[in-house]
């Protein structure tokens, strides 16, 4: 018989740096999850990612206080900023350009994000990522 689910916790945790301090500690503590056990498991699971990369995580908490978690790919905005070597997007998207990014780089990001996007093929995924880049105030160039 399957375990009874007590609830879900959605967090964005930096890869490889999970520790019991806020916001992680209080969110897990409220549900009665062993915080150190989660931190060790999460840090081991995100070992392959660059340290500090924001990682969306969905934690399933069961009635017996055990847990399981699923990590998603980093947010598109993080990957776009990293590819375009930016600290942040434009303060006024549509009026002030925040920089430029090549469509080929957006396609690479779309390949990374493909499993988390609601798209049937890579072209659709690229258009989704392109929309995110434009909403950040970036100009999309060919190439």
Curated annotation (Swiss-Prot):
State the Pfam families in the record. Answer: Ribosomal_L11 (PF00298), Ribosomal_L11_N (PF03946)
Q: Which SUPFAM superfamilies match?
A: Ribosomal L11/L12e N-terminal domain, Ribosomal protein L11, C-terminal domain
Post-translational modification here is noted as:
One or more lysine residues are methylated.
**Which keywords does this chain's UniProt record carry?**
Methylation, Ribonucleoprotein, Ribosomal protein, RNA-binding, rRNA-binding
* Subunit structure, interactors included: Part of the ribosomal stalk of the 50S ribosomal subunit. Interacts with L10 and the large rRNA to form the base of the stalk. L10 forms an elongated spine to which L12 dimers bind in a sequential fashion forming a multimeric L10(L12)X complex.
Q: What does this protein do?
A: Forms part of the ribosomal stalk which helps the ribosome interact with GTP-bound translation factors.
The family annotation for this protein states: Belongs to the universal ribosomal protein uL11 family.
Put simply, this protein is called Large ribosomal subunit protein uL11
């Amino acid at each position: 018989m399957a375990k009874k689910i007590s609830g879900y916790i959605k967090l964005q945790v930096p890869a490889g740096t999970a520790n019991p301090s806020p916001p992680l500690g209080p969110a897990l503590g409220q549900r009665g999850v062993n915080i150190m056990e989660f931190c060790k498991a999460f840090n081991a699971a995100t070992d392959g990612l660059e340290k500090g990369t924001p990682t969306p995580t969905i934690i399933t908490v069961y009635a017996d206080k055990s847990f399981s978690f699923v990590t998603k790919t980093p947010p598109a905005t993080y990957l776009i900023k990293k590819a375009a070597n930016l600290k942040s997007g434009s303060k006024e998207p549509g009026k002030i350009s925040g920089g430029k990014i090549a469509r080929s780089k957006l396609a690479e990001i779309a390949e990374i994000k493909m499993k988390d996007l609601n798209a049937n093929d890579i072209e659709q995924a690229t258009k989704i990522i392109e929309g995110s880049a434009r909403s950040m105030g970036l100009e999309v160039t060919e190439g």
